A protein has these predicted regions:
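Phosphate/pyrophosphate-binding loops and the adjoining catalytic core of nucleotide-dependent enzymes
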Residues: 2-136
């Protein structure tokens, strides 16, 4: 069993973040949620999109979506409009963060986790997974 050193991960995360290189993902997110009830927060290599109508639960389901350099934008175009229509909180790895995550020095436990979705309950989780299974 691998044990992830959280302090090392946080330090690596903050060292690699460059806001100038996250503009593609960020502008796409802004177009999708511009008039929705969301709050965007940048934290390290992530852009957190918090639904103001459905606050994050203290515990519950998480859905991770992986991506490569070849398909990340296509995945964004499919996934983001759907989860925004459900008013679900999620986070996306920024442009620079994506490159960092795919590097050989990044902790393997975190590699490729491009989008994390936080469903409100089991029913919503199943619905999202069903959509993703058909669409991706």
């Amino acid at each position: 069993m691998n044990i992830l050193n959280i302090n090392l991960f946080k330090k690596y995360d903050l060292m690699q973040y460059n806001p100038k290189e996250s503009k593609i993902v960020e502008s796409m997110l802004m177009k999708q949620i511009s008039f929705k009830n969301y709050q965007l927060k940048k934290k390290g290599i992530f852009i957190n999109c918090i639904s103001l109508n459905n606050p994050l639960q203290y515990q519950g389901w998480k859905i991770h979506i992986s991506a490569s350099n070849n398909n990340y934008f296509d995945i964004l175009l499919i996934v983001i409009p759907y989860i925004v229509s459900l008013n679900v909180s999620f986070k996306v790895v920024s442009e620079n963060g994506r490159n960092t995550m795919l590097s050989k020095n990044f902790p393997r436990e975190q590699t490729g986790k491009f989008i994390t979705i936080y469903p409100q309950n089991t029913v919503q989780c199943r619905a999202i997974i069903s959509f993703l299974n058909k669409s991706l």
